[in-house]
Curated annotation (Swiss-Prot):
This is tRNA-specific 2-thiouridylase MnmA. NCBIfam families: PRK00143.1 (NF001138), trmU (TIGR00420). Its EC number is 2.8.1.13. One of its GO terms (cellular component) is cytoplasm. The lineage of its organism: Bacteria, Pseudomonadati, Pseudomonadota, Alphaproteobacteria, Hyphomicrobiales. PANTHER family: MITOCHONDRIAL TRNA-SPECIFIC 2-THIOURIDYLASE 1, TRNA 5-METHYLAMINOMETHYL-2-THIOURIDYLATE -METHYLTRANSFERASE. ATP binds at residues 19-26, 45, 137. GO terms for molecular function: ATP binding; tRNA binding; tRNA-uridine 2-sulfurtransferase activity. Belongs to the MnmA/TRMU family. It catalyses: S-sulfanyl-L-cysteinyl-[protein] + uridine(34) in tRNA + AH2 + ATP = 2-thiouridine(34) in tRNA + L-cysteinyl-[protein] + A + AMP + diphosphate + H(+). The gene is mnmA. It is found in: Cytoplasm.
Amino acid sequence: MLNSLDLEGPPSSTRVVVAMSGGVDSSTTAALLKAEGYDVIGITLQLYDHGEATHRKGACCAGQDIHDARDVAERIGIPHYVLDYESRFRESVIDRFAESYALGETPVPCIECNRSVKFRDLLTTAQELGAQALATGHYVASRRQPDGSRAMVCAADADRDQSYFLFATTQDQLNHLRFPLGDMTKAQTRELARRFDLPVAEKHDSQDICFVPTGRYTDVIERMRPNAMLPGDIVDLRGRVLGHHQGIANFTVGQRRGIGIAASMPLYVVALDAASRQVIVGPRAALRKNLITLRDINWIGDGTFDDVAREGRDLYIKVRSTRPPQPAHLRMNGDHCEVELFAGEEGVSPGQACVFYDAPTGQARVLGGGFITHASNNSDRAGTHHLALRAAI
């Protein structure tokens, strides 16, 4: 007989490791599982130097958070351990974050953290401790499939859904992960935290980017990849120089404010060319793209990705976490994966994720996704756009 986590055996004989960040979500997850009778162990990861971030409001995984996680564990009566993952986090997340900006991309470090640190290394640690599952406080859900595997679905609370940041979870990882808050709203989570008398019940939610102590991500990039802060030209779609900038890392595709160019119409950042250190600007209409090329595909839907991509498939995609899924068609074009958006999308930037869903609303199933390398329009293949723009997008 399966317990509430879809595992064999009673809760009392089921060990679960909970990733405790010190926030209300993971703390409530631990308290809920403990109340249900599971053998719960709390683990908090020390991911970076907490000196400057310890007292910054909204920081995640900072020094105070470690103390909060320890206090919660003591309150609910579970063992709690702090693991030093700073070197792993720097290599897997911070270094890649800085390098991505240096290449003119807009990275999403939370995805890499979930994939490479929390769900890979921490899951291994949980299994070494004899745990049958690793539980987190993410707002996403999973469902048991007829063959015993797990399917990831969007959270019941659409405003809190974090599936965009979890698309890179592998099928093997997903089979061992549990998300107890996936069918709850944030309000329900806080109410549970109050009911459990948790000291973090009213704590503010964490904000990205956790490892930027000052809140200025360019400080990290300037220190680690100074070439990304070298000056260059701001040009229009025809290549005409309109002005100058102090580093491409200060810009992202879709940006309007802070360009520093006076023009008769609003100008937006349309592309970044790291090789020439050019920031390419244009009207808003130039932001809309309907063809996206992807790398590093992760597929967690039915069947294999090779079969799906070879035959082509209609699905729904997100290119930003705050946007609703848009209808699109997935296919292979030669040796690379393409997604064609039926209605197009604005501000598609290399480095961001393109996440696949099987439905546009509700608790849609997450099918996987990939990272964006290029965004264009079908007409670009005919050479109708400025060469520098085509090379950069």
